[in-house]
Amino acid sequence: MSVRIRLKRMGAKKRPYYRIVVMDSASPRDGRAIEELGYYHPVEMQNQVKINEDKFRDWIGKGAIPSDTVKRILNKNNFKVES
């Protein structure tokens, strides 16, 4: 079982927001998450990002791999994620 940290789409049509979640890599995008780590609101004036750093670091330590999109969003918001 390969675990990924990725985005889960929520919200209304044309007003999306995303939850940053830990999921099995074989799960569908909007499937059941193992744990929620934070959220990302791309529609807001200032792309709002909030993440629980302790949980994020814990999952990275357990071998979870962040998706490229999650890495880009977090690096853009001064939260350094190693490749």
From Swiss-Prot:
One GO term (biological process): translation
GO function terms (MF aspect): structural constituent of ribosome
Gene3D superfamilies found in the cross-reference section: 3.30.1320.10
Pfam family, one: Ribosomal_S16
PROSITE patterns found in the cross-reference section: RIBOSOMAL_S16 (PS00732)
Keywords of this entry: Ribonucleoprotein, Ribosomal protein
Gene Ontology cellular-component terms listed: cytoplasm; small ribosomal subunit
Key word DNA-binding present: no
Record bears the keyword Metal-binding: no
Family, as annotated: Belongs to the bacterial ribosomal protein bS16 family.
Protein name: Small ribosomal subunit protein bS16
Organism: Borrelia hermsii (strain HS1 / DAH)
